[in-house]
Amino acid sequence: MKKISKAGLGLALVCALATIGGNAARRATAQRRGSGVFYDEMFDFDIDAHLAKHAPHLHKHSEEISHWAGYSGISRSVDRADGAAERAVTPSARRIVRSASWRAPTASARRPARSRWRCASRCTSAIPTRQGAGDAGPRQSAAGAVRAFRRQRAGGRAARRRRVPAGLRPPVQRTAPGQGGFGPLRQGRPGRAAVSPNGLLQFPFPRGASWHVGGAHTNTGSGNYPMSSLDMSRGGGWGSNQNGNWVSASAAGSFKRHSSCFAEIVHTGGWSTTYYHLMNIQYNTGANVSMNTAIANPANTQAQALCNGGQSTGPHEHWSLKQNGSFYHLNGTYLSGYRITATGSSYDTNCSRFYLTKNGQNYCYGYYVNPGPN
């Protein structure tokens, strides 16, 4: 569905630089604490305030950085990530960190001395691994910004390192392709214990309304795993009136406004749902919303729908399911009492490979009325 734009490429690199330093204040609600360290950091680390204080020249990019952090599952409260960002623009280092599989932050991430370097080799996951010649400019520009900022900080960092015995410094963590890691490939493999329980989530549009539900796909729109996402719409082209079509919360939880077109709601049990291609977002970060609460409209202009990059052919919402910050394969999960089967590849609408089951009856892609969570 979406490809990372050239601007997004540069901003993904800047993300690693921009989140340097800082200890996040721990003020998470009981619900968020139960959902894991990743979500605590998502709410507690204020990117906008951090950039205003520590990197004012990057402050104008705070929304894009939040978007890409939410899009890719990158933790925000990291340190020593500037070096990783510069290394990421070289082919040799990109081969080291190219793995699509990350490991979710563990409880040790709560200790600031360690949590700030956890992303040292991972802040580049949003960077495309296949680059064309035309992509060199944004990558080199981002690298230049990283190097300039590193020179500015070099003296102070060197002094700090001299005060820390070498044996106590955290090692640079490198993830080889196909091994371990912090990401989508860790979630939803056969034998997984966690499946979104029946009754937790409803369709992300108002109860009683009928929206078109398309085939399952990955968050990027290509490949077949994890197919975490569904596109839903009421129809209409660019410029159509979408003000009466409301995207609604799939379940109660804490609201995160990543950008003007992208939001996330953190639910119980480590689950969260994301909503992209939006306009008129109704809530700010930290708000508590109930299931079925209207949160936004599908964007009716391509510029707004793609406020942080990607592709879209018309007004719709791109809905995704996450578990502990990683996109989660929908096969076997429940939505409004329907059990989802998704065994093909992205956007496959063949009814033998993508269908929803309820009360013993299978239903293909098409229009669905939202009955609520069951």
From Swiss-Prot:
Family listed: Belongs to the peptidase M23A family.
One of the protein's GO biological processes: proteolysis
Enzyme class, broadest EC rank: hydrolase
Keyword Hydrolase listed: yes
GO molecular function terms noted in the UniProt entry: metal ion binding; metalloendopeptidase activity
Region Disordered: start-end pairs: 128-187
Organism the protein comes from: Achromobacter lyticus
The enzyme's E.C. designation: 3.4.24.32
Keywords annotated in UniProt: Disulfide bond, Hydrolase, Metal-binding, Metalloprotease, Protease, Secreted, Signal, Zinc, Zymogen
Cofactor: Zn(2+)
This protein's GO CC annotations: extracellular region
Protein name (Swiss-Prot/TrEMBL): Beta-lytic metalloendopeptidase
SUPFAM superfamilies from the UniProt entry: Duplicated hybrid motif
Note on cofactor: Binds 1 zinc ion per subunit.
Signal peptide: 1-24
Bias (Basic residues) ranges: 148-164
Residues engaged in binding Zn(2+): H316, H318
Chain positions listed as propeptide in the UniProt record: 25-195
Alphabetical list of Gene3D superfamilies matching this protein: Glucose Permease (Domain IIA)
Catalytic activity: Cleavage of N-acetylmuramoyl-|-Ala, and of the insulin B chain at 23-Gly-|-Phe-24 > 18-Val-|-Cys(SO3H)
InterPro entries attached to this UniProt entry: Dup_hybrid_motif (IPR011055), Pept_M23A_Blytic (IPR000841)
Disulfide bridge map: C261-C307, C351-C364
Record's subcellular location: Secreted
